[in-house]
């Protein structure tokens, strides 16, 4: 699984097309396949965040004839510079896009990070510095 970058989201969308079995969509779209951790399926080298997902289970949904696939993440790759000390990953800084439905692509805008919500507080504390994190606050 790959996070799609803002500068190549149109090619990322086109990769979802049902190409003939003998057509290499990486070649068709000018994307670069890379292989990691013994996985048969390639990741996209241009993606700033890549995840190796192993299929664990699958259920057929009779109401719409779709399949619900359950996977387990086996490996993750991203630039170390995007990782804060407390584990926050700066996706917006990596230039990835968000997807809604099957065809809606969006850019995001950071608002703030909020403290862990607790019943005894009325509103969570805000941390505007996304990379600073809560352990440094």
Specify the residue positions occupied by each region the protein language model found:
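Basic, polyanion-binding surface patches
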Residues: 1-137
């Amino acid at each position: 699984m790959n996070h799609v970058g803002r500068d190549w989201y149109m090619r990322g969308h086109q990769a979802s097309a049902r190409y003939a079995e003998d057509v290499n969509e990486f070649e068709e779209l000018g994307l670069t396949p890379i292989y990691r951790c013994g996985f048969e399926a390639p990741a996209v080298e241009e993606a700033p965040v890549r995840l190796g997902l192993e299929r664990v289970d699958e259920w057929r949904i009779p109401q719409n004839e779709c399949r619900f696939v359950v996977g387990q993440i086996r490996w993750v790759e991203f630039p170390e510079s995007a990782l804060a000390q407390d584990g926050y990953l700066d996706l917006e800084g990596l230039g990835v896009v968000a997807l809604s439905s099957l065809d809606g692509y969006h850019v995001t805008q950071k608002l703030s990070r909020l403290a862990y919500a607790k019943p005894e507080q009325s509103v969570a504390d805000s941390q505007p510095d996304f990379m600073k994190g809560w352990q440094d606050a």
